[in-house]
Amino acid sequence: MAHIKKFGFHYAWVVLAAACVLNIFARADQASFGVFVDPLVDQFGWKRGDISFAYSLAFLVGLPTVMIMGWLGDRFGARNLMLGAGVLIGTGTFLMGAITELWQFYVVYGFMVGSMGHAAFTVLLPVIITRWFHHRLGIVMGIYFASQGLGPVIFAPLFRWMLENQGWHHTFTVIGLVLGLILAVFSLFIHNSPAVLGLQAYGLDDASKQPQGTSSSKPPIRLREILKQGIVWKLAGIHHIGCAAHAIILAHVVSMATFKGIPGVTAAGVLATIAGTSVISRFAFSIIADRFGGRITLTLSLLGQSLPVIILFFATDAWVFYLFAVVFGLCYGGEMVGFPIINKHLFGTKAPLGSIYSFEMVGAGTGMALGGWVGGSLFDISGAYDWSLAASLVAGFIGLPLALSLPRHKKTVPVPIETATPARDAPSPLLGGNAPGLKK
């Protein structure tokens, strides 16, 4: 069955819609961390470096979780994994309202919410979407990653307003219950691939459209063969550096604003503005990645997220922070969104894309952990955020040579997972052959 003919649309669009909702709500706590810092300092008297360590801990604990989720998703499917992750996020958010000690914050946020809960959605959803769509992949991934930017737009000001007006306990009790319910319901709409429902990927609904001379019964490329090549590690390194650079900003820009005398809700709006404008870059850079490949995509995004940081050295008024938020957001989202598309171009759909993406997310996770902790610790040492900003700027520029060293891209139409040409018929660049999508 190629279509849900009764309704006249392909189930791939249901998967995309559900994935977007999950993407928004799964990131509620993680993407809003910056608005928690000042209330925690005021309520408990904790140091900013100690608080931001929870942000780092979430990504560090998430490293093995990301690897495990990628492996399990490739073998057993994603739905049950995401149901469990939704329960963790909902329960953890609920328990955030009951914390009284720093170690409790580390356990609930660092383990339950920010790492083990968030990891499943982060790794599995982008890979599932690449399996469901053959045509319009760049646009579809743009829609998906654009939705990721809506989470902070909604939840950063909501959390801050509720914390200031309803208190810590009531805020997290209510939001925890809502998150758990929504994540559980929408996870039920996700299926690992079109084959589960007897469908083809969107754009390959007719047998006549399938590439000739292919067979889905032929063996896929093994992960160990891919990991012997350097490009996976290079991509993971780029993701690490890029995430370290923008984690300093995302975890601390609200505190940077309040440190300069900006009111709390107004400062939270800076983070929401970054997220809102990043919707544009997440959408645009997904299309750029599909058309022009990783080299151009990652070079532009790293440069675009680094240069605006200079503005913050001179920011004292709210309008300057909002100007920064707009300029920074227009490129920062591009650093994250291209990797699933780049992987499909470089490795093909017969490769274990979930496992490959999980390796890159390890790079991202260590970068986010490092950046979040460094930003707070440098403030505690120096009493200002100048050194934190300098660290973000330097990290971004370090990633540029790595991005420029990636293979040049040559646009081709990727082959869907059910009908992909095996490695021996269309050699992967990782196995020494010329792959579609690459120019030597």
Q: Which residues does each predicted region cover?
A:
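Symmetry-related core transmembrane helices of the 12-TM Major Facilitator Superfamily/SLC fold
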Residues: 172-189, 387-405
